[in-house]
């Protein structure tokens, strides 16, 4: 299975399954990227952890990061899903993902 191409006026969903964009220079760079996507005609949808700084080196607890990823992946309102930053601690969320639900959802 492959995701559909992102169409003009499509919606890009952003999540923070590891470190997000709560601090500089990541916050400014992310906001510049969001502005560029809007200028190109895309809509954006941000997960609740994109600007969170609740964990140590991770945007929130592994459970909350997994819930964000799960909800955004299953949300039909966004067409593609991107991480807003980080990745080093994403492996901590894996036990909390419902892989059967991910398999059933359209690919992103």
What role is predicted for each listed range?
Residues 15, 88-90, 108:
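Long, contiguous hydrophobic alpha-helical segments, chiefly transmembrane helices and signal peptides
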Residues 66-67, 71-97:
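Long, hydrophobic/aromatic-enriched structural stretches that serve as scaffold segments
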Residues 27-29, 95-98:
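Short, glycine/charged-enriched secondary-structure capping and boundary segments
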Residues 24-26, 81, 93, 105:
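Short linear functional motifs in flexible/disordered or boundary regions
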Residues 1-77:
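ATP/NTP phosphate-donor binding region
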Residues 97-108:
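Short, acidic/small-residue loops that bind anionic groups at enzyme active sites
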């Amino acid at each position: 299975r492959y995701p559909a191409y992102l169409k003009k006026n499509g919606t890009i969903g952003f999540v923070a399954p590891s470190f997000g964009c709560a601090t500089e220079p990541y916050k400014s760079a992310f906001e510049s990227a969001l502005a560029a996507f809007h200028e190109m005609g895309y809509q954006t949808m941000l997960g609740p952890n994109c600007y969170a700084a609740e964990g140590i080196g991770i945007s929130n607890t592994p459970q909350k990061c997994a819930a964000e990823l799960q909800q955004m992946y299953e949300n039909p309102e966004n067409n593609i899903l991107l991480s807003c930053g980080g990745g080093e601690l994403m492996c901590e969320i894996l036990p909390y993902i419902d892989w059967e639900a991910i398999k059933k959802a359209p690919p992103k």
